[in-house]
């Protein structure tokens, strides 16, 4: 049994409507984008926060993050019944592929080490925004670049 289970379940052209995040139960963290969540919940009109709570309850997830494109990301902790909003940092968007994967990786690592969801959400959003600027993985973010990025944006 793993201590922390994070799930990122994506819709793409090959599996639209054929996959579901609902087969994963009791995850520590679910990362899903707004349209994937609405598809999963079969609800295009309800407020995001209501759908996030419903999804968390159904999956018995401790934490849910919904990425919302240029609206940023919304984190929900079921134990604290608390939402945290992170802004969108990406102003230059060339390629979205991999940004959610990086977001999940950075968030999961920082949150498991620090238990500071706000810092993890913020840093994950910053890193994901950096991946949007280039096609593919031609621009790999170093530790030093990440530190400068976080410090600059905290000011």
Label each PLM-derived region with a short phrase.
Residues 1-6, 11-26, 45-155:
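Conserved phosphate-binding/catalytic region of the ribokinase-like
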Residues 37-38, 113:
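A short, structure-level motif marking secondary-structure boundaries and short turns
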Residues 26-35:
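Non-cysteine beta-strand/loop elements that form the S-adenosyl-L-methionine
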Residues 40-42:
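Short active-site loop/helix that positions an aromatic residue
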Residues 34-36, 89-90:
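Short, histidine-centered active-site or binding-site loop motifs used for metal coordination
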């Amino acid at each position: 049994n793993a201590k922390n289970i994070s799930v990122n379940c994506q819709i793409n052209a090959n599996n639209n409507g054929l996959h579901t995040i609902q087969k994963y139960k009791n995850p520590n963290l679910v990362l899903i984008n707004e349209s994937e969540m609405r598809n999963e919940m079969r609800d295009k009109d309800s407020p995001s926060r209501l759908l996030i709570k419903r999804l968390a309850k159904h999956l018995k997830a401790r934490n849910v993050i919904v990425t919302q494109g240029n609206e940023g990301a919304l984190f929900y902790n079921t134990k604290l019944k608390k939402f945290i909003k992170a802004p969108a940092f990406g102003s230059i968007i060339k390629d979205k592929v991999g940004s959610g994967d990086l977001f999940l990786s950075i968030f999961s690592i920082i949150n498991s080490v620090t238990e500071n969801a706000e810092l993890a959400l913020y840093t994950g959003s910053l890193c994901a925004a950096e991946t949007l600027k280039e096609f593919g993985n031609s621009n790999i973010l170093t530790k030093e670049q990440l530190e400068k990025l976080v410090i600059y944006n905290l000011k």
